[in-house]
UniProtKB/Swiss-Prot annotation:
Matches recorded under InterPro entries: Dynamin, Dynamin_GTPase, Dynamin_N, Dynamin_stalk, G_DYNAMIN_dom, P-loop_NTPase
PANTHER family (alphabetical): DYNAMIN, DYNAMIN-RELATED PROTEIN 4C
Annotated organism of origin: Arabidopsis thaliana (Mouse-ear cress)
CDD domains with a match to the protein in the record: DLP_1
Region (G4 motif): 237-240
Protein name, UniProt field: Putative dynamin-related protein 4A
Family membership noted in the UniProt record: Belongs to the TRAFAC class dynamin-like GTPase superfamily. Dynamin/Fzo/YdjA family.
GO MF term set: GTP binding; GTPase activity
């Protein structure tokens, strides 16, 4: 394919760029954002440059961080903590379409937040972003509890977020409730497999500390496409709710998480994101059981 040149004289060697798009198969050595900055971000920076060259039009798959988890695994809490904004909450499926979250660190004191869907850009703000996501989802997937594989893009520019792009997928549920389609499990499964099957996808599997990891449907799906776990990273939520045996769970690694585990405490009640992080740090430093977990694999930030 050789080098390619943009009209603004910005030059990238596409072959060299593609050669760097390999998943590093070594143990994870830092919490989620540090791990991202050290190992995944350089890869995705290359991806962004290649996207600017429209290489996907040539049929080349580019890496994506795909967030999966069973319903009620705490997936929304993890994403909220990373973005510092509220996402839709409630009973049933909160995420009904693929939500492409683009976080960008900004020096401006005022955050910029907008949605992109149906060929339009819709500005919003921190107070109304959850409502805006719900409204956009209704446009894409219809009102009710159905799902759609048409993506919705959420862009967030703030001074306290990591530079990070992820695709959040609906939580996995086996039993339809509250008017959900009878085949809701099959619909969500197809959507998830579509995103995690490509070898270029990095799977961020959100697991609740309160359950047996081997019974998680998200683990079963990710192991179908990544048997050795070489491109799977696990975030273990609700560590404060089930501290007994958590160290053994992440040490034994019965479910083959090749990129390692990160244990976190979910935000509780009316805590601000800053307060939640302080309490998380205190928990993992002082709890008689959780303090035994390596400090390099605890904490969302």
């Amino acid at each position: 394919m050789g080098g390619s040149k943009m009209s603004n004289d910005y030059e990238i060697d596409v072959e060299a760029g593609m050669s760097s798009l390999s998943i590093v198969n070594t143990p994870i050595e830092a919490p989620i954002v540090s791990s991202y900055n050290d190992r995944i971000r350089p890869l995705l920076d290359t991806v962004d440059r290649l996207r600017n060259l429209n290489v996907m039009r040539e049929g080349i798959q580019l890496p994506t961080i795909v967030v999966v988890g069973d319903q009620s695994s705490g997936k929304s809490s993890v994403l909220e903590s990373l973005a510092g904004i509220n996402l839709p909450r409630g009973q049933g499926i909160c995420t009904r379409v693929p939500l492409v979250m683009r976080l960008q660190r900004s020096s401006s004191p005022e955050p910029e937040i907008w949605l992109e869907y149906s060929d339009k850009v819709v500005p919003t703000d921190e107070e109304h972003v959850a409502e805006a996501i719900c409204a956009a989802t209704d446009v894409i997937a219809g009102t009710g509890e159905g799902v759609s594989d048409t993506p919705l893009t959420l862009s967030v520019k703030k001074n306290n977020v990591p530079d990070l792009t992820m695709v959040d997928l609906p939580g996995i549920t086996r039993v339809p409730v509250n008017g959900q389609p009878e085949n809701i499990y099959e619909q969500i499964s197809r959507m998830i497999m579509k995103y995690i099957e490509p070898q270029e996808s990095i799977i961020l599997n959100v697991l609740s500390a309160t359950v047996d990891f081997t019974t998680c449907e998200s683990i079963r799906m990710s192991r179908q496409v990544d048997k050795t776990g070489e491109r799977t990273l696990a975030v273990v939520t609700k560590a404060d709710m089930a501290p007994e045996g958590l160290l053994q769970k992440v040490t034994a690694d019965d479910v083959s998480i090749g990129l390692g585990y990160i244990c976190v405490r979910n935000r509780i009640g009316e805590e601000t994101y800053e307060e939640a992080r302080v309490q998380e740090d205190l928990l993992f430093r002082t709890h008689p059981l959780l303090s035994l977990i390596d400090g390099d694999i605890v904490g969302i930030l």
